[in-house]
Amino acid sequence: MGKIIGIDLGTTNSCVAVLDGGKARVLENAEGDRTTPSIIAYTDDETIVGQPAKRQAVTNPNNTFFAIKRLIGRRFKDDEVQRDVNIMPFKIIQADNGDAWVESRGNKMAPPQVSAEILKKMKKTAEDFLGEEVTEAVITVPAYFNDSQRQATKDAGRIAGLEVKRIINEPTAAALAYGIDKKQGDNIVAVYDLGGGTFDISIIEIDSNDGDQTFEVLATNGDTHLGGEDFDNRLINYLADEFKKEQGLDLRKDPLAMQRLKEAAEKAKIELSSTNQTEVNLPYITADATGPKHLVVKITRAKLESLVEDLIIRTLEPLKVALADADLSVSDINEVILVGGQTRMPKVQEAVTNFFGKEPRKDVNPDEAVAVGAAIQAGVLSGDVKDVLLLDVTPLSLGIETMGSVMTKLIEKNTTIPTKAQQVFSTADDNQSAVTIHVLQGERKQASANKSLGQFNLDGIEPAPRGMPQIEVMFDIDADGILHVSATDKKTGKKQNITIKASSGLSEEEVAQMVRDAEAHAEEDKKFEELVQSRNQADGLVHATKKQVEEAGDALPADDKAKIEAAMSAVEVATKGNDKEAIEKATQELIEASAKLMEIAQAKAQTQGGAQEGAAKQSNATADDVVDAEFEEVKDDKK
């Protein structure tokens, strides 16, 4: 059985870990980094992922996608998506089913399809380390992700060629990473997770007793559209406003300028975590009729803090709700763990310290803890990690729409999963022959104010006065937090059941097609690599041949030289095209045309070899004239 890997699929960065010798190990990617930017770029002939994609973003802003996780499982008309539509350099569009998709070079793509490219890189990183194919993974999601977003994440895994064995909440994974070596006692831990695009707070009880450990999530809360990207955007808007005040030009209309501004803002934000002032200096950011324009703005830490103060305050309300849901007070919390890169900001740490009245722990790596926890959970599933029990919860209440457009809850938020719940409902009208089961997720009483997860009909109900038929609705949430619903007419036994697919979401056929496309691209990628290899070999041969022609000088007959030069030109023409066979044919012809060169090189080598041999013989002859002798020390008393 192959290894199950743990993947933290992040908004800004992603990370992969695997159990190695019983310990979770974070793996380095091909660039030598332990985290990979969650950035994907599409060019004319290839898909670029990670750091290389980030490097080319300035020159290709419309086809470079970042923070795709903020769109996964979302409707185009969602307020959160509409905010992003206006600030992202790439195109966010409405799919036929109402989902938020993206567009690159005329191709419309679903967020799971784009995210799958990051997962493929994580998969390849693990395969390079393990030396074997990887087909199974545990993938983390924000604790406050709804059913649609969890389904979409599983779809991304399938498209990447991974069977997702478990979806695990990010704060829970971080608690696993922190608590796995804490062998005794009972601790209540608050995990404050402020990442690139999402915010979660989870209150988790870790019970360690005689080698057995239980990680029980008591409550969770959060905001799936609040994170480091929002902090960056505040700074980007400030810089754009300052430039407009000074120069009268709006950089927001220039995608290239905005991409440079994004990189500079992110860099400045990071620098201001360790220094009190920094300067954003972007020469030639744009130009008008009067000439090029430069952006130079000094930013203090205090200025940045004032720009994002309300975002930090927004994270505190979910803390209060989570504590209330867990029926705990601040004094009951033993440890506070910070997860996510944005928690490196001193003002965030200060806010958390003030709220909990204690310093957060500094021994948890905020960028790697989630992937480490995912790898530990993978070990639990594969049987490599024993005596660990993980009890997670559903973050939002689940129910159905009943008469008067009311949401009737069947499963309350923060219920431990997996779980089942059932309730009997009836008809609203006389002789009603069918009922529509409309499944909802959320906390509001009004049905329309909650997230619609989908609906289905149970028909064939026997005619009867209203209120008489008995329809039993069963909700079943699996360990991934994904919902299965059934409805049964208790009189006839007729049953209808579905795994909730979001009313949006990808259909089975769409996912299957994307899997096929990914496999086809894998073949294309392989061919592209082979083409590049052939090009590189051809270029290397031309370079070496030119050098040999120069070294041969007049020893190379003119007609041979002409043949070689013609063959080199043919190779150079072939390498500009995309025909691997043509490149290899031209390369072979150059090798054959260079036969005379090889003869000259061999003759020269033999001549040099002969000269060296003669010199060696002369040296040996001189050495033969030397007589070895043993010297005896003569003592004074022997004289």
From Swiss-Prot:
- The record lists the membrane-crossing segments as none
State whether keyword Phosphoprotein applies.
Answer: yes
At the top level of its lineage, which domain of life is listed?
Bacteria
Chain residue ranges for the region called Disordered: 603-639
Per UniProt, the ranges with Acidic residues bias are 625-639
Which UniProt keywords are listed?
A: ATP-binding, Chaperone, Nucleotide-binding, Phosphoprotein, Stress response
Tell me, using the record's free text, what induces this protein.
Answer: By stress conditions e.g. heat shock.
Q: Name one GO molecular function term.
A: ATP-dependent protein folding chaperone
The UniProt entry, under CDD domains, shows: ASKHA_NBD_HSP70_DnaK-like (cd10234)
Compositionally biased spans, kind Low complexity? 603-618
NCBIfam families from the xrefs?
Answer: PRK00290.1, PRK05183.1, prok_dnaK
Q: Which family does it belong to?
A: Belongs to the heat shock protein 70 family.
Function in brief: Acts as a chaperone.
What this protein is called in its record is Chaperone protein DnaK
Q: In which organism is this protein found?
A: Shewanella sp. (strain MR-4)
Question: What gene name is listed for this protein?
Answer: dnaK
